[in-house]
């Protein structure tokens, strides 16, 4: 596989990828994908996802919709709204009952690991989806206050010292299931 997993490091990540050594293989894979037969079946099928596809799916389908500024419509004209409205908190069946998705700003070597967010809130770990149910949001100080909370869960991010912090996705991962569960 030529894809590099995201890491919180510098250009040494690119240098170690051996891009030139993978040119032929990557080109062959691209041609193979272009000529792959289209799925024409009806109904259910088995789909095997690479980890890079799974983390992108979680990022887009759970991360962005649970950014509380998006839920409140702050980004409606730019990036859309969310199905995870506040009246659905602790009620919305977001996934199958055995699914747990954890936000964790303390995860070692995570892309969004920090000691404090960009509003000075200490890094935390919390369930966004617990047993398949919407359990919490990604908040900054403003959205946490609007939700009636005394503090944020530390999801504020600014891309520079001169930018206003916004709610952004922390390290968001699928938690392993219980031993013996096979779904």
Identify the meaning behind each predicted range.
Residues 1-183:
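N-terminal small-residue-enriched
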């Amino acid at each position: 596989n030529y894809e590099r997993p995201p890491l919180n490091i510098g250009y040494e990540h690119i240098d170690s990828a051996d891009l030139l050594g993978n040119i032929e293989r990557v080109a062959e894979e691209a041609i193979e994908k272009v000529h792959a037969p289209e799925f024409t079946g009806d109904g259910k099928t088995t789909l095997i996802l690479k980890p890079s596809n799974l983390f992108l799916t979680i990022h887009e389908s759970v991360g962005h919709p649970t950014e509380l500024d998006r839920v409140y419509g702050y980004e409606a004209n730019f990036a859309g709204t969310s199905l995870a409205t506040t009246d659905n908190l602790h009620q919305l069946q977001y996934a199958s009952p055995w699914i747990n998705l954890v936000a964790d700003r303390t995860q070692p070597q995570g892309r969004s690991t920090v000691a404090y967010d960009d509003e000075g809130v200490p890094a935390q770990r919390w369930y966004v989806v617990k047993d398949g149910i919407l359990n919490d949001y990604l908040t900054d100080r403003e959205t946490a206050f609007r939700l009636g909370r005394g503090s944020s869960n530390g999801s504020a991010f600014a891309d520079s010292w001169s930018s206003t912090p916004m709610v952004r996705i922390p390290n968001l991962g699928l938690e392993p299931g219980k031993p013996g569960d096979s779904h």
